[in-house]
Amino acid sequence: MVTPSLTAQADDKQARLKHLIKRLPNLPGVYKMLGKNGDILYVGKAKSLKSRVNSYFAKTIDHPKTRALVSRIHDIETIITRSETEALLLEQNLIKEHRPPYNVLLRDDKSYLYVFISADQPYPRLAYGRGKAKHQKGKFFGPFPSAHAAKETLVLMQKMFQMRQCTNTFFRQRKRPCLEYQIKRCRAPCVGLVSAEEYAADVQNTIRFLKGDSSDIHTTLIEKMEHSAEALDFEKAAFYRDQLSMLREVQSRQAVYTVQGEADIISIASQAGMTCVNVLTVRGGRVLGGKNYFPDVDSNEPINDNLSAFITSFYFQVTDDLPAEIIISHELPDQMALQEALSTYFEAKTVIKTNVREHRAEWLDLAKLNAHNALKTKLGDYLELHARFAALKEVLEPVSQSSIDTIECFDISHTMGEATIASCVVFDQGGARKRDYRQYAIHGVQDGDDYAAMAQAITRRYKKHPLPDVLLIDGGKGQLSMAKNVLTELGLLNDTLLIGVAKGEGRKAGLEVLHFIEHEPLDLPMDSKALHLIMNIRDEAHRFAITAHRKKRDKRRSSSVLEAIPGLGEKRRRDLLNHFGGLQQLLGASQQELEGVNGIGKVMANTIYKVLHE
């Protein structure tokens, strides 16, 4: 039996795909690009299946991602739909179900943040989180484009209206006010220091403020302040005076329009092969903030096609909030179909607009300005990053002639062997790929054994994931030798360039030495762009590892002290921490206060107090 050559196999595949494309209909539908093993590589929709699928093979493809996709296609499946809108909805359902690797458009696809006011307790809770949790009853406000914007709003609400933020369990178990009351960020409804009527008024003011009705709040607070002063209740009058002062300060810093607009303003800019999209969020006439995205699109495609691809990905995969208006910088080829699909999917009406006036035109101008400025900055960063990758390729020429597109780096973090965490960060010529970062909690190795910890992390990662072009290990010859042995056992040693990054003389930054398996070490000068790239990636791996380690260590320590107390089970340990608000507050509690906790009697309170104060 004669095995056909790789060239013959490739020719056969191309002929088979061309024959398949010829038989495709000129009808709307969805197409699935399949890999060698039948795995779904990419899902797309089209007004004409034949024209769209043929475009992947009938023209010169410049975008590296599309070239890589086409090279891996072994089969194509199609589903005919009744309309372009139906095709778009089916496409998004298939993407969510199968998560094809080549459908990743946005590096940062985290859900937006929302401020939430609960509605299932007598004293509602103020909180924030990503996405609208379907199981929670209450009102959601947002979306906020950044964590900073959401947290800042939450802090302002606490200072002005002093709503509680604690969990329901914590709230129910309180016997005395917590620290939030002491710093005037909560009125302690848990222990009855505020009436239900007063708290309800604070809740309503918070809701009105988040909706943009701050003028009504201003009038109400003035009336309450004057009424309290006339009644000689100067403490309460001072409280309303402080609220007024904070409200005026906030109003002076916010861009507020007289209309009650609710819109997302989306502008796209493209230059030198890079694309930036700015999404400006307006709710209640207030600009809540904006966020820049750099989608992985082919900049040679028409800019309105790329904008359409971004909007589709953004609303179906990132946000779960559809505003009444979507104002965009360029008309879309499928604008009505997309508008109809979004309205169907969210079960809410929206209108996509391009020609706008007055305040809407101001919003659009602001989004355009942000997109262009962000693109200019990103291009500068990209050129520097590209220069660093090129410098690294040049430095490594004596070691390897392979291309360098992806780099991964591992680091280990622990405190004297406690709570060991391994991190893996991923970089390419576009920068950090944070969606591909991973943290590994290390188990079953001797405390402080960095070699065994690193071996476990590398094994766990590359049993499931392909190797990068360059694999950096934070450490010298010992760590490098260990990594070599692990990759040899996995049969993957020849699939990557393995480099150990060792601290130089005196462990000073900038004096790092690069170690290789079959090459002499390299000592790069401090001004080397290649060294700067390696240091940047290594430092990011260290940051990612130590952040996770500290979180795990602190959580373990807070419970380990209580675990040493005989007769104190997990439930009562949790009740104690919830009651006092944390370990530090628990350490400051008297024996009598310990006795006041549900399930803690006099004998147990005495035991706890003795153990904590020995």
Swiss-Prot record:
GO terms for biological process: nucleotide-excision repair; SOS response. It is found in: Cytoplasm. SMART domains: GIYc, HhH1. GO terms for cellular component: cytoplasm; excinuclease repair complex. Residues 26-104 form the GIY-YIG domain. It comes from the Bacteria. GO terms for molecular function: DNA binding; excinuclease ABC activity. Residues 215-250 form the UVR domain. Keywords: Cytoplasm, DNA damage, DNA excision, DNA repair, Excision nuclease, SOS response. Belongs to the UvrC family. The UvrABC repair system catalyzes the recognition and processing of DNA lesions. UvrC both incises the 5' and 3' sides of the lesion. The N-terminal half is responsible for the 3' incision and the C-terminal half is responsible for the 5' incision. HAMAP family: UvrC (MF_00203). This is UvrABC system protein C.
